[in-house]
């Protein structure tokens, strides 16, 4: 008699979300990179849907492929076009609950990103240009006064 050995149920969790650029402005293409880890040893191989969301809209849906090895980690990415304001971006593992897991409560992680408008950066640039012009004007004025006082 052969008794099959069942693999334990997996436990997938989002361990990290990184984004680049770190300080996006409106219109930037922001690359989100999520690390997904199976916390259970020796579970069976699995293809897992991963959803990137901005809370309202789906940013990207991709697939993480796990081989069933011990403490396996897989990295997945999505690209989001930055809009102005504060955002809570979310990565959700198996959003439709198609895969049975030993723990379904750790299948999502959120990050907060603040996006400034491109105009904010333009305002700072304008101020720097204005300050530079004032400094150049002062230096030129002092040079003229120095020149006139020598005559």
Each language-model region and where it sits:
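Extracellular/luminal regions of secreted and cell-surface proteins that mediate adhesion/ECM remodeling
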Residues: 1-123, 129-133, 137, 141-150
């Amino acid at each position: 008699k052969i008794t099959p050995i069942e693999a334990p149920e997996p436990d997938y969790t989002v361990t990290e979300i990184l984004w680049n650029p770190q300080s996006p402005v409106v219109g930037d293409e922001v690359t989100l990179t999520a690390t997904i880890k199976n916390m259970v040893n020796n579970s069976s191989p699995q293809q897992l849907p991963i959803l990137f969301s901005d809370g309202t809209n789906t940013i990207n849906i991709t697939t993480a492929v796990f081989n069933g090895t011990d403490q396996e980690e897989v990295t997945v990415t999505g690209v989001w076009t930055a809009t102005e304001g504060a955002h809570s971006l979310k990565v959700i593992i198996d959003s439709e609950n198609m895969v049975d897991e030993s723990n379904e409560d750790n299948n999502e992680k959120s990050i907060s990103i603040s996006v400034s408008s491109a105009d904010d950066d333009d305002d700072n640039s304008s101020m720097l240009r204005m300050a530079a012009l004032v400094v150049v004007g002062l230096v030129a004025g002092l040079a003229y006064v120095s020149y006139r006082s020598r005559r």
